[in-house]
């Protein structure tokens, strides 16, 4: 949570104004709550414009790549995250999800989310290493092939045929084949306006949120209702 989110959007009383008065030695009324003592959660979701940056690899590094942010409040972290993700253009997938979950740690991080998707009726498509890992851990899935591999179904073809509703693609390493295959999948998702997530923690949290929160039950509240 950024300072601006805590200082303004999350607080009925502006903490930035309060801090400024303290620094200037002006009299202030002592807050009746700790800075982080809230009965609700605030989450900011970044918005990216990779669809306008032709051929750019839509994967995040240390550089600032977002072109905007949306800060949302919720009664819990799942509600706040789901509201924020929807606000920056993500959609709830209807049926088919493509998984390529990176290295061993990221695969382990995504395992419970993959199980949750299956429990909620989603069909999982996975590239080689991810497919093997899911199968070994009892999660049914369909193997798809990288652009550089022979065989069908091809992940890229499924994307172009609009057979995939969301892509989770976690970059694994810097090998030529990994970068080339991953780039083609990520770039196709962006160009075809298919929701793409490239971070395992965010993907897991988003999946748990939309699987356990019914959209009809997602509360719509004004900022003034959070006190």
Please give the residue ranges for each predicted region:
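Glycine-rich phosphate/diphosphate-binding loops that line cofactor/substrate pockets in enzymes
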Residues: 85-97, 116-119, 158-164
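Single conserved hydrophobic/aromatic residue that forms the stacking wall/gate
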Residues: 1-12
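Peripheral (often C-terminal) accessory segments that flank ATP-dependent C-N-forming ligase machineries
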Residues: 18-94, 98-99, 103
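A general structural motif
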Residues: 77-83, 101-105, 123-126, 145-156
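Peripheral docking tails and interdomain loops at the edges
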Residues: 146-147, 152-227
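Short internal beta-strands
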Residues: 98, 121-133
């Amino acid at each position: 949570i950024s300072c601006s989110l805590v200082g303004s959007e999350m607080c009925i009383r502006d903490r930035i104004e309060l801090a400024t008065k303290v620094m200037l030695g002006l009299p202030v009324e002592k807050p009746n709550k700790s800075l982080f003592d809230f009965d609700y959660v605030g989450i900011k979701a970044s918005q990216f414009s990779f669809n306008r940056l032709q051929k750019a690899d839509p994967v995040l590094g240390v550089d600032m790549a977002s072109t905007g942010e949306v800060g949302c409040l919720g009664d819990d972290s799942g509600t706040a995250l789901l509201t924020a993700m929807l606000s920056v253009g993500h959609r709830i997938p209807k049926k088919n999800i493509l998984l390529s979950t990176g290295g061993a740690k990221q695969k382990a991080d995504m395992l419970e989310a993959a199980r949750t998707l299956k429990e909620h009726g989603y069909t999982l498509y996975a590239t080689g290493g991810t497919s093997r890992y899911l199968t070994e851990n009892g999660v049914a899935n369909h193997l798809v092939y990288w652009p550089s591999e022979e065989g069908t179904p091809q992940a890229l073809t499924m994307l172009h045929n609009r057979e995939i509703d969301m892509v989770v693609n976690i970059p694994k390493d810097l090998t030529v084949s990994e970068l080339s295959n991953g780039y083609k999948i990520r770039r196709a998702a962006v160009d075809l306006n298919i929701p793409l997530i490239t971070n395992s923690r965010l993907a897991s949290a988003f999946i748990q949120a939309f699987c356990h929160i019914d959209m009809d039950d997602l509360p719509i509240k004004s900022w003034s209702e959070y006190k």
